Amino acid sequence: MSLSVDRLSLSSEQYTRWCAETPSLPLYVQPWWLLAASGCEEMPVLATRVAKEDAPTLVWPLFMPTRRHLIVTPYCQFTGPLSDRSGAVGEEPFDRDRYIAHLAAMEALGEALPSSLRYIEAHLPLDYWDWLPSETPAGVWRSSVAYTHRLDLTQRPPQELYNSLIRRKVRRATALGLRELWAETTKEATNVATCAEMLVELCRKSLQRSGGDRLCASSLRRLVTAAVARGQGALLLLLSPHTDEPVAGAFVAHHAGTAYYIAGGQARTSEGEDAMALLLDRLIIWSREADCHTFDFEGSIQRGIAFFFRSFGAVPHPYLRLQAGRQTLAMRLQLRRYYLQHLY
């Protein structure tokens, strides 16, 4: 079965409209999120469409900080070629014609990528593996599996799913009398900016202790501002009753019924030891009140704390991390310059 496939370049208006008409897409690929995370004024979007169809079949927002890099945008769990509907491959019953159409569209999309690319990254659901092209301008794909952790907010009170450790931490932190400072509206712009700076400092301290990557602070500030302005996010800080200094903080954004834990940090003090459990408990309650059915603990800057997430009753969900090509030293230095100018 041979299909004719059109290659398209979508304007920002066309991509925004396509996202609005495709409710299955997550927060991470929404136009406003991508622009705030990347610091770009506009992001090129490549698309393919099976002939005789009105809407694009596959769409790929291209974050290319240099002409040789196509990489994952900061604070984005999923990025890469997007389907016009979720489960196009793994759906029941199996739709053979749809599957073949996606294979053809994906092959055309791979061929349309800029030939200058030498290194490509993508994070995608597992079912994409069956229809990814084996070749890219940067070479063949290499894959690994990563996990996000999701908590179902619909079945029963989430607190019933917490293990004994988390319940004990929440009780101890509650007894400390920590003061809550929220940034969830733009009525006090200064408050949002001040809270964002406090969160940045807490995240930096946490990353320094864990030996993690450098914080994309500029991206985080823009995301907090954009999400709060749209009514799709909240930043919560817990302050010491003795010093009025923040001991823990986190930023959560939501879209289409899912709340996403984006970033968080805590101070290395006796008060901060249990504060993060109380903080997340408060944000989970906030997410339910915002009519979210799922709390996603992905935490784009958090590494090595999966056990902590599972202690809240969250269930691991696998996804693909894909890479093609290699970075030379010159490419790494060029990419670092971009990060220093726009993201750090």
Give the ranges of each region predicted by the language model.
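Terminal substrate-recognition subdomain of acyl/acetyltransferases
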Residues: 2, 124-179, 294, 299-344
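A conserved beta-strand-loop-helix scaffold within acyl/acetyltransferase catalytic domains
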Residues: 3-53, 62-68, 127-148, 156-270
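Short, high-confidence coil segments that cap the C-terminus of an alpha-helix
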Residues: 42-45, 114-119, 233, 292
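Conserved acyl-donor/pantetheine-binding loop and adjacent beta-alpha core of acyl/acetyltransferases
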Residues: 64-80
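A short, internal acetyl-CoA/4′-phosphopantetheine-binding micro-motif in the GNAT/acyltransferase core
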Residues: 76-96, 154-156, 264-273
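Aromatic (often tryptophan-rich) hydrophobic motifs at membrane interfaces
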Residues: 95, 221-334
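Well-ordered, non-membrane alpha-helical segments in soluble/globular domains
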Residues: 96-109
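ATP-hydrolysis module of ASCE/P-loop NTPase motor domains
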Residues: 111-127
